[in-house]
């Protein structure tokens, strides 16, 4: 009664695989932990919506003509609704400081020019010392409102220090085009000419930026708060600031590279830890299997064996009632080695030893040769 198929070795069950490391679950949160936006992100966590709502911006070109001088070409952005047409604007340029000093209404068809230099920046810091992030350069805003009151067809802003003046409250000022000029040497030349009261005229047209190295970003921050001096209309806060995109681009690339390397290192460490844990568990399991096999071999070596001794009469044709090996179903022959189990059943030694290495039980009565008990299987 040999088995149809030998089952696998009865060894201790393998330990369950180690659970996934918590670091693997935290890897998707690594960019958030390190700062997904990288350098230049908003301090309050709010996300800017560039060119949103009524604070849209488009690139403009300003051609300035001065007497007995070469024409100046300036670049900037126009603040206004994206749906509004961009008609050709032109007229005489007048500096608001001079207009305020003369206390006279300029002629029709003129363009107001307001600027913020070092003196205005120092005054702005002095006036807004200790104030919150919603403090605005009030003098500049008052100049802009006075220009609209006097009938200026457009507002031209010369902000020489973009790092100082970032936020302008221009509530109710979008009835006229507001143009912020990029800083360049031509802006300085224009400002010097206007301070000398040189008569200058300008034409403002929409167009693409002429310089690839200068970028301006108009950002609409809805979290900056409402205007303190608004007239009850649209009172969101337009934050004007040079984005310096080309300057921040290498820094952003460096930040992305550092973030990528950090994620790769963390992933490599997690994978290495998982492999070490897997190898350790395999070594432990292999050691347990080897120990179990050595125990079975020692037990088999301690079992009794004997040589089969048959009478001369039995050495001829086998008797139908003669004993057989329950493993190979063959008769016991003279001088064969037999294995005698503790349950007194005998088998061919070469047949039953491989069975005992796999099952450790008697093929007939299921007696466990290791534990000296009968198996319930």
Swiss-Prot record:
Domain of life: Eukaryota
Residues making up the signal peptide according to the UniProt record: none
Gene3D superfamilies named among the record's database cross-references: 3.50.30.30, Zinc/RING finger domain, C3HC4 (zinc finger)
Transmembrane feature ranges: 23-43, 251-271
Compartments (UniProt record): Membrane
Membrane-topology descriptor: Multi-pass membrane protein
Origin species: Homo sapiens
Molecular function GO labels: ubiquitin protein ligase activity; zinc ion binding
GO terms classed as biological process: ubiquitin-dependent protein catabolic process
UniProt-annotated stretches for the region Disordered: 1-22
Biased composition (Pro residues): 10-22
Segments on the Cytoplasmic face: 1-22, 272-377
A Pfam cross-reference name: zf-RING_2
Keyword set, alphabetical order: Glycoprotein, Membrane, Metal-binding, Transmembrane, Transmembrane helix, Zinc, Zinc-finger
Cellular component aspect of the GO annotation: cytoplasm; membrane
Record's protein name: RING finger protein 215
Extracellular side of membrane: 44-250
Residues that carry a glycan: 186
Zinc finger regions, RING-type: 325-366
């Amino acid at each position: 009664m040999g088995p149809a198929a030998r089952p696998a070795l009865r060894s201790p069950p393998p330990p369950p695989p180690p659970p996934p490391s918590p670091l693997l679950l935290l890897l998707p949160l690594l960019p958030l932990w390190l700062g997904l936006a990288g350098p230049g992100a908003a301090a309050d966590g709010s996300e800017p919506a560039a060119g949103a709502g009524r604070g849209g911006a488009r690139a403009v070109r300003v051609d300035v003509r001065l007497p007995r001088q070469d024409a100046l070409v300036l670049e900037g952005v126009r603040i206004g609704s994206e749906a509004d047409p961009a008609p050709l604007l032109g007229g005489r340029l007048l500096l608001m400081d001079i207009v305020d000093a003369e206390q006279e209404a300029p002629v029709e068809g003129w363009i107001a020019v307001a600027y913020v230099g070092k003196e205005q920046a120092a005054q702005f810091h002095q006036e807004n010392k200790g104030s919150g992030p919603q403090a605005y350069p009030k003098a500049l805003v008052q100049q802009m409102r006075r220009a609209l009151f006097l009938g200026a067809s457009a507002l031209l802003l010369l902000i020489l220090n973009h790092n100082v003046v970032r936020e302008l409250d221009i509530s109710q000022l979008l009835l006229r085009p507001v143009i912020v000029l990029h800083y360049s040497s031509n802006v300085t030349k224009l400002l010097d000419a206007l301070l000398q009261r040189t008569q200058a005229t300008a034409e403002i047209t929409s167009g693409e930026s002429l310089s690839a190295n200068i970028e301006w970003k108009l950002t609409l921050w809805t979290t900056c708060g409402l205007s303190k001096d608004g007239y009850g209309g649209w009172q969101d806060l337009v934050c004007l600031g040079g984005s310096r995109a080309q300057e921040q681009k290498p820094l952003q690339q460096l930040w992305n590279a550092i973030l990528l390397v950090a994620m790769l290192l963390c992933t490599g460490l997690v994978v290495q830890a998982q492999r070490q844990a897997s190898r350790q568990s395999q070594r432990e399991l292999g050691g347990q299997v080897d120990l179990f096999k050595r125990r079975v071999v020692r037990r088999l070596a301690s079992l009794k064996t004997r040589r089969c001794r048959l009478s001369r009469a039995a050495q001829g044709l086998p008797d139908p009632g003669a004993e057989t090996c329950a493993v190979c179903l063959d008769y016991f022959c003279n001088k064969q080695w037999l294995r005698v189990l503790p349950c007194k059943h005998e088998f061919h030694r070469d047949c039953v030893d491989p069975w005992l290495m796999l099952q450790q039980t008697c093929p007939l009565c299921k007696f466990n040769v290791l534990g000296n008990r009968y198996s319930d299987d």
